[in-house]
Amino acid sequence: STGESQELPVSTRLVFKNDKASGLGVALPAGRVRVFQAETKGDTLIGEAQLRHTANGQSVHLDLAQTFDLNATKKEVKSTLSDDRLSYTETLEFTLSNAKPEPVNITLDDVLPRWQDWEIIESSHDWSQLNAQAIRFNVAVAAGKTSTVRYTVRYRWPSGNKP
């Protein structure tokens, strides 16, 4: 509902291409992958994930673990149903916080669940369409800072399918 913030989980995702340029380029069998970060006092486990069978040339996306120094909240700022009840407009706001000592790039995916006929009529950031009902924002957030993503979507229903 309007005005209430919803906490969203934030996870660390490792994305790479299975090719020779990335130091791979062979078929990778399915199985558990553990990712470590090299540090002066030894390696630190960042997380682990299940890898699916991956052919040479395919992209790999591994969701490693929930991170606690990045936070995200979602809030509906405004919503309006048209007088003829054939369109619904809502403004959503995401607050992305980075408590890390270095800048990060956050990929924010959002689902547009109300209807397949939608249009983004205003947005604070560039976005791309993932599929018929989802969009993606790529947001750079400076170290110790917060960034706000805000967009307005208008859904339209055919006259026989009013909400």
Q: Can you say where each PLM-predicted feature lies in the sequence?
A:
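Long, intrinsically disordered, low-complexity accessory segments associated with secretion
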Residues: 1-163
